[in-house]
Amino acid sequence: MTFRKYFDCYDFYDRAKVGEKCTLDDWDLMKIPMKAMELKQKYGLDFKGEFIPTDKDMMEKLFKAGFEMLLECGIYCTDTHRIVKYTEDEIWDAINNVQKEFVLGTGRDAVNVRKRSVGDKAKPIVQGGPTGSPISEDVFMPVHMSYALEKEVDTIVNGVMTTVRGKAPIPKSPYEVLAAKTETRLIKNACAMAGRPGMGVOGPETSLSAQGNISADCAGGMTCTDSHEVSQLCELKIDLDAISVIAHYTANSDIIMDEQMPIFGGYAGGIEETTIVDVATHINAVLMSSASWHLDGPVHIRWGSTNTRETLMIAGWACATISEFTDILSGNQYYPCAGPCTEMCLLEASAQSITDTASGREILSGVASAKGVVTDKTTGMEARMMGEVARATAGVEISEVNVILDKLVALYEKNYASAPAGKTFQECYDVKTVTPTDEYMQVYDGARKKLEDLGLVF
């Protein structure tokens, strides 16, 4: 049976007003974990410790489980406390009509984002930047310039301005609007100073309200060739502010980057259960948000990292499955435990770059060092490693990738609780010349040597 019209954010808003009532606790503590557990058992999902899947039948079962999760659960609206349900036809229509490619940036700095596959020989797009990490106002430009100066980096992902004109960008205040506009203006100036004025950016990151996000589209700020962020909530939830942002993005013909970080050990539960939710979230991105691409980021509930053994498995299986059975374009964001200028930070980022590249990700986004929560602890050097490792991994046999990852993760996974704090950007770089210190170069070379010993060929 055909459907009356294509589903969009306006339909979502209308259904969020009349859908089935549900409490937040019932959603988080009953509906999500129970359905994920039920689907894991129904499809007999067992990843058997693999980072990147080699069992196509198991991948197909995972896709069916993720599809069913979205169909049967729907999406919870936190403002109306109602559930928005989709029909099976609406879900398939979104999957079958995704944006298959797009261009980020302009001129000679523009990059084409196209579908990759598991084991693809092409290097993914590297979106380098603080990835939502807090950055001091006085070094905001040089921090982002450190990424634009890296040739491995194709586009920039914004950091968060801790202040603007010395004031906190409080949500729904004039300072939030000013920060949302200033954030991208400063970054684009930094790119121009690095000789790459046409680089695309991804944001805004500072603003937390719809008015802030919408105001970032402005003269000298974000344009339709930049990635415009809207975030789903964990797990399979959204608020109406985000729906309003989507309405603006679609009406403005913006590239839409739908973001969400499924939590391993959280509401969904274990590895397979969280991956089911991750697949459902990917599909919801193109249905609810009309997303050009989905920015993933499975994160460990205890360690706050995306680079653990468990979260890498979730990321690898989710992306490989989405890549195998859909044309949805997918990225992943990086949150190591360790801080900059440490070998552990670089090895953590490398493990995720290997996983993402081999599993078919189109975009790698990072690195938010020190879990992305410490001011000024992120630099362009971590993105250089992310890019170099991606280049070295592209085209490597999946069986070999799984062996390398097992050995690599073992090098740092016992050190999460005592992860080295690392150094700030100001300690890692000459701020005036925006060049890394000799110390960081030596640390970088040491990490690179360990990766070569594991079998990567740079």
UniProtKB/Swiss-Prot annotation:
Catalytic activity: Co(I)-[methylamine-specific corrinoid protein] + methylamine + H(+) = methyl-Co(III)-[methylamine-specific corrinoid protein] + NH4(+)
Enzyme Commission code: 2.1.1.248
Metabolic or biological pathway, per its Swiss-Prot or TrEMBL entry: One-carbon metabolism; methanogenesis from methylamine
Bilayer-spanning residue ranges: none
GO molecular function: monomethylamine methyltransferase activity
Xref: InterPro entries: MtmB_MeTrfase, MtmB_sf
A GO BP annotation: methanogenesis
Coiled-coil positions: none
EC top class, as a word: transferase
Keywords from the UniProt entry: Methanogenesis, Methyltransferase, Pyrrolysine, Transferase
Similarity comment text for this entry: Belongs to the monomethylamine methyltransferase family.
Subunit relationships: Can form a complex with MtmC (MtmC1 or MtmC2).
Function: Catalyzes the transfer of the methyl group from monomethylamine to the corrinoid cofactor of MtmC (MtmC1 or MtmC2).
Protein name (database record): Monomethylamine methyltransferase MtmB2
Protein source organism: Methanosarcina barkeri
Organism phylogeny: Archaea, Methanobacteriati, Methanobacteriota, Stenosarchaea group, Methanomicrobia
